[in-house]
Design a protein with these regions (language model features):
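Long, basic N-terminal domains or extensions that often function
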Residues: 32
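Active-site rim elements
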Residues: 17-19, 181
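Flexible loop/turn segments at secondary-structure boundaries
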Residues: 24-27, 47-56, 139-143, 201-204
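Active-site cores of enzymes that catalyze phosphoryl transfer or operate on phosphate-rich substrates
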Residues: 78-208
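Short coil/turn segments at secondary-structure boundaries
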Residues: 9-11, 43-45, 147, 207-208
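Extended, regular secondary-structure scaffolds
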Residues: 19, 35-117
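Single conserved hydrophobic/aromatic residue that forms the stacking wall/gate
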Residues: 1-9, 13-14
Length: 208
């Protein structure tokens, strides 16, 4: 009992600050739908840090990173085999081939979105629904060629940029890089979630 209470308490402590109103509302919808027995699947991003952890020092507010994962993520079930590729940038080429319309994308940056499932049980209900949280990483952890040349910072640069997508909830957007990061977060969430929905549909019904 004490171990379970410690687990629940630590997890609640990690998640109880830094969440936005819309995220809280979506969580309530998931909880209510599951309690009523409705089949629902939710999608979001597996953020490493919340907005901030606040302390008052000598009467002044001090902001510190709020690490949501520092005590682990025991409730999440990672599914690396179901990871999807999300492509950023590049060019799309279109052409006709034998009367069929075809496309190809070149010059893009590839980011891998890995799903982590959180299962939600309903109050006074036998229903269990799933919330899928996406984490972002590069297909390769670092550039071996750059590392071999002694360019160690550049060897890790691309992976760091990819991981930044799922690093912080609500990054500051009062500058151009912050706006770009928020757009990348939104694009990763939409692209990976739609791919997951379509893949699951095709697996069960074999056609759109």
């Amino acid at each position: 009992y004490e171990m379970l209470r410690s687990l629940v308490g630590s997890e609640m402590c990690i998640r109880d600050s830094g969440n936005g109103g819309l995220g809280r509302l979506a969580s309530c919808y998931m909880d209510a739908a599951t309690g009523l027995g409705y089949p629902v699947t939710g999608f979001s991003i597996r953020y490493e840090f919340g907005i901030f952890r606040q302390k008052i020092v000598d009467g002044w507010q001090m902001e510190f990173p709020d690490n949501w994962l520092e005590m682990g993520d025991v409730w999440l079930h990672p599914r690396k085999d179901d990871a999807v590729e999300v492509r950023f940038g590049g060019q799309v080429h279109e052409w006709m081939d034998g009367g069929k319309f075809k496309t190809a994308q070149t010059g893009y940056q590839s980011v891998i979105a890995v799903p982590h499932d959180l299962y939600i049980s309903g109050y006074n209900s036998t229903a269990v629904n799933k919330l899928t949280l996406w984490s972002a990483s590069m297909p390769q952890s670092f550039d071996m060629n750059a590392f071999s040349r002694g360019d160690y910072v550049r060897a890790l640069e691309q992976n760091t940029m990819a991981e930044a997508i799922s690093k912080v909830l609500y990054p500051a957007d009062n500058h151009i890089n912050g706006k770009r990061l928020r757009l990348r977060q939104q694009y990763l969430l939409v692209s990976s979630s739609l791919q997951s929905i379509l893949n699951e549909h095709l697996k069960n019904y074999h056609t759109l």
